[in-house]
UniProtKB/Swiss-Prot annotation:
CDD domains for the chain: AAA, Caliciviridae_RdRp
Domain SF3 helicase: 564-720
Lineage: Viruses, Riboviria, Orthornavirae, Pisuviricota, Pisoniviricetes
Annotated segments matching region Disordered: 37-98
UniProt: ATP binding residues: 590-597
GO cellular component terms, A-Z: host cell endoplasmic reticulum membrane; membrane
Annotated catalytic residues: 1222, 1243, 1305
Species annotation: San Miguel sea lion virus serotype 1 (SMSV-1)
Protein's recorded name: Genome polyprotein
Amino acid sequence: MAQTLSKISNKENASVGLWPKRFKPHQPTPTWMVRCGPLDHDSRHGRDPVRASPQAKRVRTPNPYPRHLKPAASAVVRSGTNPSHLKPTSTDVVRSGPETPCCEAKDGGVVRSCKTCNLKPAHDSKAVSFFPAQTDGLTGDEPEFIAEACPSCVLYDTCPNCTSRAINDDGSTDGTIPSWDQIETTPAFLSLLSNTDEEMSADELTNLAAHLRKAFETGSHPPNVDYSKDQLQGLLEMAEAALPPARRQTLPFYQQRLEARRTWREKIFNLPLDELSKILTTSKDRFQRCAAWKVVLEKAVLAKEYGEEAYAYAQEALKNINSFDVNLVLKMAAGTFIGHLRMMTVDNPDMVSYLPKLIVKLKPLTLKMIIDNHENTKEGWLVTLTSLAELYGMVEVAIDFVPTVIGNLFDLLMKTTSKVYSMFKSVILATFTSESLDFTNPFWYAIAAILCFLITGAIPHNGKMKIIKNILSNATGIVAGVKAIQTLGAMFSTWSNERLVNDLSSRTIAITELNNPTITADIDAVINLQRLAETLREEVKSHTLNPLMQPYTPILRNLMSALDNVISCCTRRKAIATKRTAPVAVILTGPPGCGKTTAAFALAKRLSQQKPSIISLDVDHHDTYTGNEVCIIDEFDSSDKVDYANFVVNMVNTNPMVLNCDLVENKGKTFRSKYVIMKSNSETPVKPTSRRAGAFYRRVMIVDVKNTAVENWKRENPGKPVPKWCFNKDFSHLHLSMRGTEAYWREYVLDPTGRNHQSQKAPPDQHVTLEQLDQKMVVQHTTNTSEFVTQAGEVPVFGFVCQNNEIDTVYNLLAAVKARYGANFNLYKGMTRTAHENSGCGAHVHVISREDNFRGKAFTVNRSRLESVPHLEGDSFRRSLGVVMSDKDVTTMFYYIKGKVINDQVNLTELPANQHVVTVHTVYDMAWALRRHLKWTGQWQLIKAAYEIMCYPDTAACALRNWMDSTDFSEEHVVTQFIAPGGTIILESCYGARMWATGQRLIRAGGLTEAGGPQGGVRFAGLGARNVPWSEILREFMTLISHIWSQIKGATVVLTALTFYLKRFRPRVEAKGKNKNKGPRKNTGVALTDDEYDEWRQYKAEKKLDLTVEDFLQLRHRAAMGADDTDAVKFRCWYSERQRNYHDLEDVTIIGRGGVKRELIRKGPLRPRGNDFYDEPDDWYSEGVIDGVTHKNAIVSVDDVDGMHKGYALHIGHGVYMSLKHVVSGNAKILSEEPKNLTFNGELATFRLNTTLPTAAPVGTSKPIKDPWGNPVSTDWQFKNYNTTSGNIYGACGSSCSLTRQGDCGLPYVDDHGVVVGLHAGSGGDKCPSRKLIVPYVKVDMRIRDTCTKEYYKDNVPMISYKGLLVKETGEPRTIMKGTRLHVSPAHTDDYEECTHQPASLGAGDPRCPMSLTGIMVNNLQPYTEAPRTDTATLNRVTKMLISHMEGYVPKIHKTEEDMISAFYMLNHDTSCGPYIGGRKKDHVKDGVLDKNLLDLLSSKWNRAKCGLALPHEYALGLKDELRPKDKVAVGKRRLIWGCDVGVSTVCRAAFKRVSESIMANHALGFIQVGINMDGPAVEDPFKRLERPKHDRYCVDYSKWDSTQPPKVTSQSIDILRHFTDKSPIVDSACATLKSNPIGIFNGVAFKVAGGLPSGMPLTSIINSLNHCLMVGSAVVKALEDSGVQVTWNIFDSMDLFTYGDDGVYIVPPLISSVMPKVFSNLRQFGLKPTRTDKTDAEITPIPADEPVEFLKRTIVRTENGVRALLDKSSIIRQFYYIKAENTENWTVPPKKIDTSSRGQQLYNAGLYASQHGEEFYTNKIIPLVQRAIEFEGLHIEVPEFHQAVQAYNGYFNGTEDQPSQIALASGGTGFGGEVFEN
């Protein structure tokens, strides 16, 4: 669809007189290009013109312009460039273009008739369009003009309004234009709604529009069946929203569409918001909806004129897509609940009398008896209902009413059920026939239509219904039915998404059209517009993350780009209009050569870490200004042509200074440096007689710079250069003297009167150093930044909106309330405000009508009732007005105080009522009382005031004055009277404060404490709750609950205590007969949960006890609280055993003679009970199980061979466990395994298991603080041998209150940090239960000893130097393979020198480069000896940004491959096995079975990896056999081969295979292009992303990429991959391995890499690409922040990248493009070497828009066959020169044997690639090479012609034919196949 937008855009517009590409001036003008009127097709074909019908509707033109855009006079404005709101002042008809008006305007500017244009009256229409006479040679009368009732008809009809008359209802024509059948078969029409590049011609567009016009009028026309009239307009609307306003003229019908929206705007501008909301949600006319959006947003932007309601509505509407306002419903529900609760509790005037009456009415005792005797039977319900009716006196009513209602309902239910059943049965039987399905019943069509309406929000039209019918009618079987349902679901989803995109496009158009200075004239409008654009952008962005919206992602991105332009434009306009802090300017004056420039730069470095910006006043534009904190202006007064005085005055100012810039992107740039350093050789830059002298010298500090050594040298040595010793690094050679303020010379300052400039002597100069000058400038800037801001801020304004006849009533009511509560607000009638906002004033309250344009908090008066003053208590004023106000708003309105006021004169009538009276005896009394008035942030001012009063008690009033100037007061209204020895102080605070202080004793009694204030709670009336925030609703609910509790808390406590008291002494019911001595089973008042009930029954059954429920619960409670009585101890033991054996029981259902019952059956054998006591007091014994121990997730049970629990073991990490010797002795089983590698250290036992728990406990050697159950333990931590029942145990004795039992041995003791320091080994038994025996932890080396794994780089081998490298000897020589498999072709033995590439250097015997292979290897390894550095903080931030970006398209968790063999078969078996096993992987696999050597190696690596441990990271090094440029061959440059160990590759593939596949599968959405097929349709995705408007494109390559990779960046990339895995031990092992330093093995030595990334590392392409993204992102963030732009957003949301290893394409916006030189500089600081793709040393610059982009050695261009990635010609040509065959050292000799089959296929494919470069290259260059190869190499292939080659490649490209293996390999890399053809 996105391509179709450009397809129908002809780049010319009829309104400006431009012709489309396919039309010439001599051709007839097409109908859609006529400016003023349609072609007269009736006259052309010999028919009389048809007059308009009398039923033509009339149109009224309202005047809905806002008051800021009202025209001076009315006029009819037609198509032109003037906006709709700029009306001309004349009464003439205004046309576009320079034509002279030809019509007579009568009746107020309305066109009645025109002889020149042949216009006739159109039924007295108020506003008409007109068409001038035809100028294309046509003759005859013109058709009468008809005023349309709907402005959109101009769009839907357009010029085909006349041509549609030549079309019949069935789609046939009279031959003048094509019929509908012919239209449908045109290629352009068939591609209209498809993703093709064919452009629709103007004739076809005109004919199609004519048929559409006919289809709009006639329902039987064929397009109504197949297509929707909204499809074409929807495409145009999306195109208009995506294009910038300047380019929208290129769209067809743009002026007509614009005129339609303008006309709609005029019609609906004055409608209220609710009517506009209906249009937005229900209108099917897209032009009407778009105009409605523009009206809503325009009123929101101009909130000053139309009120905050419009802005709030627009903000909410932009976020919602026709959604139900659930928030309002919830608010209304909450408000209703609170209101009813208040009515029943607080508002009830007499709770005491109301409750008894309610109880008597309810008759609870009788009601309880009826309920208790109810039975769930028919007779029971009849008796119960009759009893209830008799109880409440409704017997007769029930007898008459209930049977009638029940009977009627039953009859209605039976009839409805019968009819529904019959209909449903008939439909089902008709659908599911015996042979097939039949969905042709209208019932199914209706169901599908309803579903379509529910999903898409619109009823399907005829075309859609036809599609639905076709789908349902074709569903004749089960499979077809399922497919039909899937098809309908997908189709409904597509329609819904299209409607959504159209809606977003309408909003975007409205936003962009409002970005006009004529509309958004003030800063408030600009701010509102930016907020609305940001809101809409977030909405659009949220839809881009929806997977169902992926087909529309390009359109949504274009919408976001358009909104970004609006936001950036608003930002610039705000910056221009925003007040700034005046910079600090200093002028360094002195003679030339004294060192001013060096001092200026040194001062700039002290002031800021950024490099200073440089401005030169000799040029008239300042595009190079960077906006850094410090700005240096050299010789600012050197040119007399520059008005530098005014420049400095404007620069050092609080008003924004807009710089003069030439570049468009820099328009609006402002000066924003903090410090300005200017230099001058003149002591008086501005003459004192100048008119700007005062303003100039007031803004600058002048420092005279003097260098005595330089002056003496010049005086004593004239003509000689100044030596360096005259200058010192510490600037001690300079003498800096700062002048006084306004000193234009050292001796004089400016005269204030301006009469005598030498009348005022200047103060002495102040000697300063650079450091002092730096401090002064910083202090001065801090002073400039600080400005006085009133604490209270803007005075709040409230408005009560009512009818005109209610204004006096509401005003009098508010005046009475103000007098009653002593309120501080100012009351007005209407909008006029008479009170001044002085300190101490209150809020402004206006009583206004609905017509007033009020700005502020408005509350609608639902009713007005003037109460008497005694009735205005509590919240009656809100009830009387029917307004919904929160308590916070009421407090603010009544008692808001602006600023702080201190009154020395006390007037009793002005004093507020006291809330608190405090007698001040000490300073603490006052401090404690003052806390009520302060915020939390103002407590420290309170401490300061208290200290002053304590030191000087007689000056309390003065101390309070000083304290009020600096403190922050609370938003609550508080009044406190302080009675001090020196007088009385009354303090009132609410936002601000008022204080009255007098030396007399004044007692102001009474107040609001008892009567209460006006804050009586929120009253929710109707929909008024929508204006109350949720915080106020919650606050009101909590206040109401506290109020209710304050009324009932006393009675509640008393009744609760009474209930407990009566329950305690309740007599028990004794049973008789058989149940004697048994507790009662019924009506005991005890409720048990299911688990408690099961415990009670099981405990009674096992212990053979007759235990009541109450006794059981008491026993259970005592045991849980740790009681030590016998019953409690036994219950704890039983409960622990039950918990441990929970899984040994099975709940089964038994069916037998006794019926069906459920029982718990034990699955394991019954264990014998152990002994409870030992005779000897010092015996230690093993203990039982108790839940809730520390580190319980790391603890496992140790069982005997028969399943008997023995103790515990603790997991300490990587499969290592520790326990005790007497626990694991014998045949112990842990997790059904026997311990391995069992090691004893005294009593402590350490061992391994194959099972690794996910949780491990930390271990240490400190002193224990807590026992296993978290209780404190006391111990001296002295170790000795103790005699136990298990022998002597070496440990320490401790004391704890925890009770232990058998089986607790092995539980951990921890220190204060939770680290395990010992294990529990026993206790003192029942005679001394608090004594515990603790075995300390001792570190044991449990590292795995490799038995099968070889490792060359060993720690115990000394380091040696080998040819300049630090290496270790391996003891096994490994030589570098010599020779090459590349031979010169027999066809080119004489001219192979013409080829640009040759086989790489072969070593010392090679005449091209005699360097040995070892020397080449060592030279290649030298860069790996150093580790590049990066900015760690920035790198960590960018890593989080990249993860957040990738989470949008990469699934979160990928499962690890757990099978070793499966992981091995995921590898490429044609690659090396690494340093430990020779050959390739496939050499060790026979018939799918691995040989012993490979299997042993993989098993050892896999077992180690399952423990999460790192593997040896070693590689076998070699040199790559490939073709290299001849210049690189001459210097011996040859690339390394890193052969990775097959075990490491298998582990890494198991860990990250699925993650890498997800990243590769989503290359179209992300930055990483690994997996892209460059020879398929996938190449179109990057091509589209490259066409991003207003973005710069950079193509970058890197030299020596592998050796320059920082290890920190590689580690972060590996962590990113781990983030998307399940983090299993295999993943941990892979991460630890890849993060370790690689080891290279060659020539019998092992070399450890310090930095860089081996090219043979697993996942090298993915990791390299992630490294690429991270380093580019870090460089961009650092460059922006160094330029003063703080990056607080995700940088990857602002740019687009293509990365594949070291190849990169960066698509950046202007902001980032402006700092790209710094970005490349930062990349070089990271150690990288960025270059151009052509490998030249020129600067990296953006790729122009008209030049193709090169990526992966491919040039991405659009050819006549589509988008193609062209392989460079040199890569294709050199394939004919060389052949890969047997190994040789004489590569200039052709091979002895040539594989003609593969060689022929190779050259055939080369021809296919060459065909994409054009016929000339293919015919003149490639065909001769192919023919020569056939002749000399003996090949048997046919040379395809050019068009055959193009057709074959297109077949491979589009997937219609399978790609040959070489093309498949080449599409993901740089060559055809193998390393022969790599660059």
